[in-house]
UniProtKB/Swiss-Prot annotation:
GO terms for molecular function: ATP binding; RNA binding. InterPro entries: (+)RNA_virus_helicase_core_dom. Homodimer and homooligomer. Interacts with capsid protein. Interacts with host AGO1; this interaction targets the host protein for degradation, thereby suppressing the antiviral RNA silencing. Transports viral genome to neighboring plant cells directly through plasmosdesmata, without any budding. The movement protein allows efficient cell to cell propagation, by bypassing the host cell wall barrier. Increases plasmodesma size exclusion limit. Acts as a suppressor of RNA-mediated gene silencing, also known as post-transcriptional gene silencing (PTGS), a mechanism of plant viral defense that limits the accumulation of viral RNAs. Keywords: Host cytoplasm, Host-virus interaction, Inhibition of host innate immune response by virus, RNA-binding, Suppressor of RNA silencing, Transport, Viral immunoevasion, Viral movement protein. PROSITE patterns: PSRV_HELICASE. This is Movement and silencing protein TGBp1. Pfam families: Viral_helicase1.
């Protein structure tokens, strides 16, 4: 337990529960360092093993990486992206970013982190205006423009099927957010038919948090605000 708590403390996770019971629940926002903390824990202590319901790591020489399946050895089990699948009964700790998923109701957290190291203060301000509790300290840019007057650029993402069809009909290469979940890009264009994140808040949140340097939102009338 000591090394587990030490790693969470190093990565600035805040303890929000006075008692700890298994599985220990750790929640964070995108870019908070959750995966990095898990990888460090695996390298520091061979008693731990981690599986993910998301995208597993590429295997490394040490054998200390986030896996798709258990090895079969008796180890302290960590489960990343636990919201996306069943939780083994013997799980020691479970991790997730609940803001990115509506699969199931998240468990009550023991540790949280709302600070993202991925994007900057402009995205922080936008997300807070839209109702999400996310903080950031770096520098980035956010632009909101009319979908019919400004061309999309760089990495283009969407979540609405009709938006994908519109982009394809104009020969624009774009990715549905499900295809790039967990990935990050320097510059992202998010194309949407909405003026507020209403249809699917989790998918909209994912589209709004894929970038590290700049975000361009293309929507009707260049308006994207809280409902």
């Amino acid at each position: 337990m000591d090394v587990f708590l030490q790693v969470l403390n190093k990565y600035k996770f805040e303890r929000v529960s006075s008692t700890l019971n298994k599985p220990i629940v750790v929640h964070s926002v995108p870019g908070a360092g959750k995966s990095s903390a898990i990888r460090e824990l695996l390298k520091l202590d061979s008693r731990f093993e981690c599986i993910t319901r998301g995208r597993p790591d590429i295997p490394n020489l040490e054998g200390a990486f986030i896996k798709a399946e258990r090895s079969g050895e008796s180890k302290l089990l960590l489960v990343d992206e636990y919201i996306e699948g069943p939780i083994p009964e013997d799980a020691f700790a479970i991790f997730a970013d609940p803001l990115q998923s509506t699969a199931v109701s998240p468990h009550r957290a023991h540790f949280i982190k709302t600070l993202s190291h991925r994007f900057g203060k402009c995205t922080d301000s936008l997300l807070r205006d839209l109702g999400w509790d996310v903080q950031a300290e770096g520098q980035d840019s956010v632009q909101i423009a009319d979908i019919f007057t400004v061309d999309p650029r760089e990495t283009i993402v969407y979540f609405e099927p009709e938006v994908g069809e519109l982009l394809r009909s104009h020969g624009v290469e774009a990715s549905c957010i499900g295809e790039v979940r967990g990935a990050t890009f320097e510059h992202v264009t998010f194309v949407t038919s909405e003026n507020s994140p209403l249809i699917d808040k989790a998918s909209a949140f994912q589209c709004l948090t894929r970038h590290t340097k700049s975000l361009l939102i293309l929507c009707p009338d260049a308006t994207y605000t809280a409902a």
